[in-house]
């Protein structure tokens, strides 16, 4: 993560000087490190993010029309893969600016926002 390969697009045959892990980048990018660590913990805590079969995904995964090619949003529903959460909405904005789109009606609990993860969040967003 955040590895500097010195511009080498395919470092498979490059020496260790190119492929080594620069641990100083972890400290420099601490916010990103903590965010990814939180995402991993969220994935481990919720079976819905670990659906093992294509059939399971087809049953529970529904993509939303965001009207923006830079925004991906989907729901995982009906306690997917035995999850404790009835329905999960995931939205990722790959744009530099804010995006707006309609989400399904529900009282959503916001667990992840602006690079911060709080599984015990009490922040809500109506759909």
Predicted regions, residues:
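Carbohydrate-interacting/catalytic domains
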Residues: 1-127
């Amino acid at each position: 993560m955040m590895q500097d390969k010195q511009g080498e697009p395919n470092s498979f045959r490059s020496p260790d000087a190119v492929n080594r892990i620069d641990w100083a980048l972890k400290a420099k990018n601490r916010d990103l490190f903590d965010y990814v660590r939180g995402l991993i913990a969220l994935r481990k805590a919720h079976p819905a993010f670990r659906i093992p079969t294509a059939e399971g995904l087809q049953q529970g995964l529904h993509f939303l029309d965001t009207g923006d090619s830079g925004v991906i949003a989907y729901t995982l529903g009906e306690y997917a893969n035995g999850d404790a959460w009835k329905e999960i909405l995931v939205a990722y904005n790959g744009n530099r600016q804010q995006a707006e789109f309609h989400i399904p009606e529900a009282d959503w609990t916001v667990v992840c926002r602006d690079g911060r993860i709080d599984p015990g969040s009490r922040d809500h967003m109506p759909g």
